[in-house]
Amino acid sequence: MARKGNPISVRLDLNRSSDPSRFSDYYYGKSLYQDVNLRSYFSSIRPPTILTFGFRLGRCIILHFPKRTFIHFFLPRRPLRLKRRDKSRPGKDKGRWWAFGKVGPIGCLHSSEGTEEERNEVRGRGAGKRVESIDREKQNEIRIWPKKMQRYGYHDRSPSRKKNFSKSLRVSGAFKHPKYAGVVNDIAFLIENDGPTSHLLKRTLPAVRPSLNYSVMQYFFNTKNKMHFDPVVVLNHFVAPGVAEPSTMGGAKGGSLDKRIRSRIAFFVESSTSEKKCLARAKKRLIHFIRQANDLRFAGTTKTTISLFPFFGATFFFPRDGVGVYNNPFFEYAREQLLGQLRIKCRNLMGKDKVMELIEKFIYLGRIGKLIKGIEMMIEIILRKRIIPYGYNSYLNEVQKMRSFLSNRTNTNTLIESVKIKSVYQSASLIAQDISFQLGNNPISFRSIFSQIVKDIPLIMPKGVEGIRICCSGRLGGAEIARTECGKYGKTSCNVFNQKIDYALAEVSTRNGISGVKVRISYSQNKKGRAISETYEI
């Protein structure tokens, strides 16, 4: 009698030399909690809109293994509908599906003191994001929850907020980490620019606005340690000579510009240092301030001048790569000049010891190091130096924040890698998730799903794919008795140890119960076909 081979799930490199107790019920709750929190965090980073790409629930795949957790993001191609819309409207601004564009303001805290008009105002402008507070003694945080969690059934059960909001801030992102407490008093202050270069800024600086929101919310709820300074004076100190840009806000002069900056920040600081102010008034002014902050322009570029406005508590932002200015010697010289002026002015204002402490703090937080090197647009998750749209940099910046946050909070080495999928058959997990989505949303039979998947396999077989095997178990089609249906195309040998196989498992909750999907893809030994799991160094 022939000996039965080990299951393919055990022969995978990811699951070898692992503790069997890892798959017991003891760790199930921990894995479920981790998965739900990761998905809610991803969806809160950037909700999708009609013309902008965002993290949508179900568009990321999280694979938990005994020693690693893989997170797969799948970025589709630009829809044909948008291409036709751009051609039909030559005079309109063309929306780019991969660009993050303008980030909506963070919705303010809902309370009983607020009027119905203010609540409708928040819902209209803050669509997609909602701030819910959690009044806990041990957690001095606020979490940005997605407005709606589909497919999972996890509703927003966070308690309603209390009057004392000094205990109730939780901002989604890397600012949760305790190492950012040293810069909690720093405030972002910027100048509005509505000049002819605003269209360039929308393409080159899409990742700045989320950081401004985090910084504003972070400073607003700090009521213990206050930092008294004049934002306008500090701004004038830190802008390099000859690098300033004239005001373009409707012909406003420098004095009126200073007054606008002061008026925007005056009530902002007063509300943050007093807990006895009217909560409804503070909420209304905060919403107005955040909306104005979302419309600010963070840098302006012309043929002869450059305007760089650094601020504490966030990253130093400069023109992005992809528009032909990143390697310009003039920009490099202006960046070094700004850094030199920053050190000189800091030394004159605070003294050498304080300056060195501040510089070390920024180096520890990754600020000055990035400034000296030039802002790193492509972090190590892009390994093959592919040409991608520069709007994609926003996604990379958010992933970098997410990676550092997960690494610091879990004390593990977190690697989030971006892999370009040339074919859907490169990932068994993608096919398994796609089948589970179809079974959960549409009453479609397994045979029709299988026929749609395998119809393009003959076209990609010369590229390294030998075959595919798909099994689906459960009450398929509403049957009273659960059964298993399998489909096979090509060669799918599961009894050879040196066979290159990608395996994935997915579950979906339907009205008839839970159904499971297993996908195995076999790759040729001679060709260069490989799965996503093989792109990681395991």
UniProtKB/Swiss-Prot annotation:
Basic and acidic residues bias (residue ranges): 120-134
GO cellular component: mitochondrion; ribonucleoprotein complex; ribosome
GO molecular function: RNA binding; structural constituent of ribosome
Protein name stated in the entry: Small ribosomal subunit protein uS3m
Annotated organism of origin: Oryza sativa subsp. japonica (Rice)
Region of interest: Disordered: 111-134
Record-annotated membrane-spanning stretches: none
The keyword Secreted belongs to this UniProt entry's keyword annotation: no
